Structure formats: structure tokens, C-alpha cells
Amino acid sequence: VARNLVGALKFRRLLPVADLMAERIEWLAPAHMLSGTIVPVPPAHARLRRRGFDPAGELAAALAARLEAPLANCLERRGRGRQVGRRRAERVAHPPRIQARSAAPRSVLLVDDVLTTGSTLTACAKALRAVGASRVVAVTFARRL
């Protein structure tokens, strides 16, 4: 089911699916985790151009609306391309370069659609902490599809 929902959002651009995914995150995640400013994991520039939208951004916006929380797009990707298709060792050895575009909120809820190795979330958390975040909690809709 998770694979179908992620695929519907990412590849068929069925944006209402993002709200359903956000509802599941809200329902399943412990309440203490779901606080702070919502920050989506930034997309690769090539993927954003090709798709014309940001699936993680849509999920983050839907979650922010459900939680009535602020949303901040304060991260961007720099180079290194796709993680999809890389083996675990490659992903860990060559994490994406993530940079903060602005100062980070003190408390952040980092949102992505799928967790594979955690290297992208780790890179995002490091970038957020480097510009002022003191608490970074990550949530994803699915793990390894």
C-alpha cells in the first residue's frame, strides 16, 4: 500500500495523496515528535524540473496544514545527483550536499516521503543545525520501498 501511495504522488502527480500520507504520519507518529517548523527535504534540481513539483514538499505542506504548523523551505540541494539506484554503501559514502538558504528555526520537523539509508536526512539535519536549529526530528511516510 505504501509503495502505491508514494508512486501515485511521485509518478502520477496525484496531489491529494499527500494529504492521505500526512494523515497517516499524524496518526502513527508519537505526538511529541510532531512539533516545530515543518521543513521538507529538498528535491534534486533535475527531478524538480522533470516532475514540475516537489513530492516531499507537497507532503510537508499537507502535514503542516494538518498540524497547523509553520512551513519553511529553507534547504537546498547542491550537486551529487540522485541517490535512487545507488547501493547502501554508496549512499552512505556519498551523501547529498545539502545547504541551508536561511537561518533555521530552533525546532524543526524534517519531512520526506521515503527513508532508505538515512543519509539524506542526516545531511539535512547537519545543515539545519549549522544554521541554528537546536532540535531536528525527522519523519517519513515509508521506509525502503
Where would I find each of the regions flagged by the language model?
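A structural signal for isolated positions on well-ordered beta-strands in alpha/beta enzyme cores
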Residues: 37, 72, 109, 136-139
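Mobile, glycine- and charge-enriched loop segments
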Residues: 101-117, 135
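PRPP-dependent phosphoribosyltransferase catalytic core
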Residues: 122-145
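Short, well-ordered alpha-helices that flank and scaffold nucleotide-derived cofactor binding pockets
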Residues: 23, 27, 61, 65, ...
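Extended interfacial segments that mediate partner engagement and assembly in macromolecular machines
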Residues: 1-62, 84
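Short, glycine/charge-rich flexible loops or terminal/linker lids adjacent to PRPP-binding catalytic cores
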Residues: 45-52, 57-108, 144
